[in-house]
Each structure stands twice: as structure tokens, then as C-alpha cells.
Amino acid sequence: MSGSFDYIGWIVIPSLQMGVVVCAIWARSFLRFFPLNFYMLVATLFTAARFFTMVQYGVRSSQYYYFYFYSDALLTICLFFALMCLFSHVFQEMGARIYIRIGAILVIGLISAVSYGMVRQAQDKMVTHFAAELSQNLYFVGAVLSYVLWVAIRKLRETRTQLIQLVLALGVYFSAFAASYAQSVLYPNSLVWRLVSYAMAIWLPLAWGYTFLRIPEGARLTTARVALGSR
């Protein structure tokens, strides 16, 4: 990264992420959507840690290389649990929260096993390859589950505007990253996937922050609009 990308990556994005937490606290939604806010807090802390690691050891150092991929894998896991939090809110009237939590743990365990199986032959930097593969697979699964959740919202005629906005924003984020990972495999020298990562890193905190700030907890969509969307 250089120039304006440095400014975006080290200053703008962490500021937006902390802005989400502030907006959630102001809207009294911090605890209700704690996994979402926890992700933003951890993302901000990891960005600061990456910056200090880069300053201390250099952007091409092995220390920065390892920390970047390990922290990215942990962030993706946090984001996956944020998605499961949204699942819990959508299905809360069915009393399915405990099953969703168990399912989330099982899915992460399965994805971890698959990711390990895909990289276990790599003798060089196997752990780093595993972290990168785990992140990539979680993004693909997250994109699919976001679509499943959106279908459930339409079928159940969910009307909570705030919840719907949070789901849509995260669905766009997961889908864009999954597409960018696929594109990077086909065209490894292309800069498109890097631009997408910056755009989505700005998009998600902006969308969530706007939702907490501008959409009240009790806001509802009209039943007619939800019914029309489910057809």
C-alpha cells in the first residue's frame, strides 16, 4: 500500500469501525448486537497492531507476513459469528438460538478441517497457508449463508428494518470478498480484488453505522412490502 491507500487503510477504515461502536452505543444496541460490535473493536485493534508490526519490522518482514494472515483468519471467524448473531435474531421466536450457536461451531470446525486438508501437503509455511485458506473458505460459506438468511427473512416476512439492513450490508460484504478471492485465483496479478477489499472495508462500517444511527430499533417495514418481496 502507498499514498492514499495508506491513509485509507491505517486511518479512515479504523475510524469508521470505531464509529460503528459509538453509533451502536448511542442507539443502545451495543449489547443486542454485541458480536457485530466486537468484530469492529477487534478489527480496529488488529489494524493498530499491524501498523506497529509494520513500523517495527517492515512490510516485507516475516513477522508482519505471519501476523497479517493470522489476524485476518481471526477477524473472519469473528465476522462469521456476527453473521450467526443475525441468524439468532431472525429465528429468535423459534427458540433456535442454541442450535444456531452449536451449528456455527460445527461449521467452523468442518471448514477448518477442510482447509487443513487442502494445505497439509504444503511443507513451506503450512500454518500461514492454512490461515489464508480458512479465511477464504469462511468468506465463501458466509456468502452462501447470507443468501440463505435473506431468503429466510423474506419467507418469514421479517419486518424489523434495522435487522434487515444489517443483514443486507453483511451479505454484500461477504459476497464481494468471496468474488474477489475467486477473481484473485483466476487473475493473481490483478489489482481488482485489492480495490474491492478496500471498498468493502469502507462499506461495512458505513452501512452498519448508518443503520444504528438513523434506523430506530422499533422501525418496521410495511407487511405489504415484505409479502411482495417473498413472492
Where are these regions (language model features)?
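N-terminal topogenic module of multi-pass integral membrane proteins
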Residues: M1-R60
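Short juxtamembrane and helix-loop transition motifs at transmembrane-helix boundaries
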Residues: M1-S4, S29-F34, R60-Y68, Q92-Y99, ...
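Individual alpha-helical transmembrane segments in multi-pass integral membrane proteins
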Residues: S4-Q17, V42, G58-S88, A104-I108, ...
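Internal transmembrane alpha-helix with an interfacial aromatic "cap," most often the third helix
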Residues: Q17-R28, F51-R60, Y70-G103, A113-Q123, ...
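Alpha-helical transmembrane segments of multi-pass integral membrane proteins
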Residues: F38, L45, S71-M84, I100-R120, ...
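Alpha-helical membrane-inserting segments
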Residues: L45, A49, T53, L83, ...
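Alpha-helical transmembrane segments and their interfaces in multipass membrane proteins
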Residues: Q56-S62, G117-E133, Q183-L191
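C-terminal transmembrane-bundle signature of multipass membrane proteins
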Residues: Y147-R231
